[in-house]
Regions:
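Hydrophobic, well-structured mid-protein blocks that either form specific transmembrane helices
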Residues: 113-154
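Acidic, serine/threonine-rich low-complexity disordered tracts
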Residues: 30-124, 159-248
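Bacterial N-terminal signal peptides
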Residues: 12-24
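N-terminal secretory signal peptides that target proteins for export/translocation
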Residues: 1-10
Length: 248
């Protein structure tokens, strides 16, 4: 069951890819240099046609160039028997000279004695990222542009909003830094509860992994996400769909 819990936390990483489009809407990001605005968004998690739970994403500006970004996953119905606790991720970051710089990152599955918790600290003066990941020590060199799994969404949003197609990002994933590649697969018209919408589809993956994430972003809605999928070995195991979006 604990491995299932960890997979569900990993799903949170899939969910936050949706945030790139939500942020674009929240910031009215015609200009990639414009700072993102606060928002709260709710997504349904679909598993083989069943709504297995919901994810809430919340971005809060805490200072002139500082932000806190949170993801909370909660199972519903019979799925709560397997995943009774809230699975959360929190990133704090700043935007300095047009660059997103993560400061701290924390993830846990809601259990006080969890061995799956991740806590990271980014020191941009010493150029090191330190902390613990699943009870293993982390001490890695911090190269320019390195992101955590939440802060990368803001950087990706700025790339897409500027009209550029991002090719890859370096992410710290637990106790390793990995390169994730991004591919613009084309455009597609989708029939949605909001009507027929033209979308841009992106694929995200990395070398050596059979996990693929796809996003459908509605350009006419400021890159609002209307569909996302996570696939393993070519089979879709989770889908996501936005339900609510609130802004101050």
């Amino acid at each position: 069951m604990r491995s299932q819990r960890f997979d569900c936390r990993a799903l949170g990483g899939t969910v936050v890819w949706l945030a790139v489009a939500v942020l674009a809407v929240a910031a009215r990001a015609a200009d990639a240099t414009e700072d993102p605005a606060d928002f709260t968004a709710k997504f349904a998690i679909e598993w083989h046609g069943i709504t297995a739970g919901y994810t809430t994403l919340e971005l809060t500006r805490t200072a002139a160039n500082a932000y806190t970004y949170k993801s909370r996953n909660m199972a519903r119905g019979i799925f709560r028997l397997a995943f009774p606790d809230v699975i959360s991720q929190t990133s704090t970051f700043t935007i300095v000279d047009g660059e997103v710089r993560p400061a701290t990152y924390h993830a846990d599955d809601g259990e006080s004695d969890s061995d799956k918790a991740v806590t990271l600290r980014f020191d941009w003066q010493t150029r090191r990222v330190t902390g613990t990941a699943e009870k293993k020590p982390v001490d890695l060199p911090l190269e320019s542009g390195t992101q955590d799994t939440l802060s990368v969404q803001i950087e990706l949003m700025r790339e897409v909003a500027s009209g550029r197609s991002p090719k890859s990002f370096w992410l710290i994933d637990d106790d390793q830094i990995k390169e994730y590649k991004y591919t613009r697969e084309g455009t597609e018209t989708l029939d949605t509860p909001l009507g027929n919408l033209e979308t841009v589809r992106y694929r995200s993956d990395r070398a050596g992994s059979d996990r693929v994430t796809r996003l459908w972003l509605a350009s006419s809605l400021g890159y609002l996400p209307i569909r996302a999928e996570r696939s393993l070995a070519g089979n879709v195991d989770f889908g996501l769909e936005i339900r609510e979006l609130k802004r101050p």
